[in-house]
A protein has these predicted regions:
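Positively charged, low-complexity terminal tracts
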Residues: 1-118
């Protein structure tokens, strides 16, 4: 059975690496929230972050292409062209925190164990 190596968690979801035995499978990040799971590369996670930022900008009253308001919810685009998510403003903020927290931890670990090592 595969275990996980947690990257970041908030009240809305979790991000983690899958592990096989003691080895971390680091080429993809599992992101779970709202009964959904996404298996993103770091590039896709960064792209998702940019799409979230676009949606937040639109939510704040700016004109952003590709984001449509649906009642009191939003359509959040994902790196998967055929998949958009209908979310509330509260969910948008929670997803934003989850993705930003995950990217922060990934970048911090890269610095500590990668480029920042002497």
């Amino acid at each position: 059975m595969k275990d996980i190596e947690q990257i970041y968690r908030n009240n809305f979801g979790i991000s983690f690496y899958w592990k096989e035995g003691n080895e971390i499978i680091a080429d993809k990040i599992q992101l779970l929230f709202k009964q959904m799971g996404f298996y993103f590369s770091i590039q896709e996670l960064n792209e998702f972050h940019d799409l979230i930022e676009n949606c937040v900008t639109d939510h704040n009253g700016y004109d952003t292409s590709g984001v449509k308001r649906v009642f009191n919810k939003f359509l959040l685009k994902t790196p998967y062209v055929a998949l958009d998510l209908e979310i509330s403003p509260v969910e948008l903020n929670s997803i934003k925190d989850l993705v930003e927290g995950s990217l922060f931890r990934l970048n911090l670990n890269e610095y500590i164990y990668g480029s920042g090592m002497n």
